[in-house]
Amino acid sequence: MATMQCDVVSVKESLYSGAVTMLIAKGAGGELGILPGHAPLVTLLQLGPIRVLLENGTEEIVYVSGGVLEVQPHVVTVLADTAIRADNLDEAAILEARKNAEQLLANQKSDLDSAAALAALAETAAQLETIRKIKNRAQ
């Protein structure tokens, strides 16, 4: 099976570097499936999971809070603002953050409060989507 080099990095660390058969991510125009030999592409990443399919048939899932995806025919690079291995996401903490954001939105005192609450809600929704992907993978 054909492979391509994949690097998933954040400001803080490199989360993955190696050969993959496919990468699936949400770009500015929607979900993208990147295979070896894909046409060159640069796009902004949306909040949510990135799925990296490995040669051995397993899958790595990483949550990203945005960033840039660069695709060359045999190399794909994810430069994420924040990236967390899906296995390291804390569902209880995310649910608590969502609850706090909902309370902030309900008690907003300014447009700034509203914007911060909506951003936090979007981030927690994307993190919970990433956790769901892991749970579906386990079944």
From Swiss-Prot:
Offer one Pfam family short name for this entry: ATP-synt_DE_N
Primary location:
membrane
* GO MF terms, alphabetically ordered: ATP binding; proton-transporting ATP synthase activity, rotational mechanism
| InterPro entries per the UniProt record, alphabetical | ATP_F1_dsu/esu_C_sf, ATP_synth_F1_dsu/esu, ATP_synth_F1_dsu/esu_N, ATPsynth_dsu/esu_N
Cellular component terms (Gene Ontology)? plasma membrane; proton-transporting ATP synthase complex
- What's the domain of life for this entry? Bacteria
Q: How does it sit in the membrane?
A: Peripheral membrane protein
Q: Where in the cell is it found?
A: Cell inner membrane
What is this protein's function per UniProt?
Answer: Produces ATP from ADP in the presence of a proton gradient across the membrane.
Q: Which HAMAP family match?
A: ATP_synth_epsil_bac
Q: Which family does it belong to?
A: Belongs to the ATPase epsilon chain family.
- PANTHER family under this entry? ATP SYNTHASE DELTA/EPSILON CHAIN, ATP SYNTHASE EPSILON CHAIN, CHLOROPLASTIC
Provide the assembly information: F-type ATPases have 2 components, CF(1) - the catalytic core - and CF(0) - the membrane proton channel. CF(1) has five subunits: alpha(3), beta(3), gamma(1), delta(1), epsilon(1). CF(0) has three main subunits: a, b and c.
- The protein here is known as ATP synthase epsilon chain
- Give the species: Acinetobacter baumannii (strain SDF)
